[in-house]
From Swiss-Prot:
Source species taxonomy: Bacteria, Pseudomonadati, Pseudomonadota, Gammaproteobacteria, Oceanospirillales
Protein's gene: atpC
Any GO molecular function: ATP binding
Predominant location category: membrane
Organism annotation: Marinomonas sp. (strain MWYL1)
Protein name in the entry: ATP synthase epsilon chain
Pfam families: ATP-synt_DE (PF00401), ATP-synt_DE_N (PF02823)
Length: 139
């Protein structure tokens, strides 16, 4: 039997995952973070991207988070996400359209464009697509 830790992934709308896991990998502000049982206590921010959990039975689940916080305690890992969606529920076509729209806004050089918002939309669309790709690779 593998060594495990309890993990909760929640957003303002819902609890998306709660269970025992062998490990978790998330997109932290300074790069990917790998969390395993016995990890030192930690509180950090998360970037938009995939959170990959390896469940107690070895099955993997990929969840997209749009940012948030990751807290590690001795026997519990908590992801507090701005929004969270299971990778299998993501709409690739919508993410591709959002990415293209953001690229067009950034390329047009118009004075009424909010470049900060367009950049954030591009980053989130790319993170959604990266999550979809990671989900496909884990199948």
């Amino acid at each position: 039997m593998a060594i495990t830790v309890h993990c909760d992934i929640v957003s303002a709308e819902q609890e998306i995952f709660s269970g025992t896991v062998q490990s978790l990998v998330a997109a932290g502000s300074y790069g990917d973070l790998g969390i395993m049982p016995g990890h030192a206590p930690l509180l950090t921010t998360l970037q938009a991207g995939p959170v990959r959990v390896v469940k107690e039975n070895g099955d993997e689940e990929v969840i997209f988070v749009s940012g948030g916080f990751l807290e590690v305690q001795p026997h519990r890992v908590t992801v507090l996400a701005n929004t969270a969606t299971r990778a299998r529920d993501l709409d690739e076509e919508a993410a591709l359209k959002a990415q293209e729209h953001a690229k067009e806004l950034l390329a047009n050089q118009k004075p009424d464009v909010d470049y900060t918002r367009a950049t954030a939309e591009l980053v989130e669309a790319m993170a959604r697509l990266r999550t979809i790709q990671q989900f496909r690779n884990n199948k």
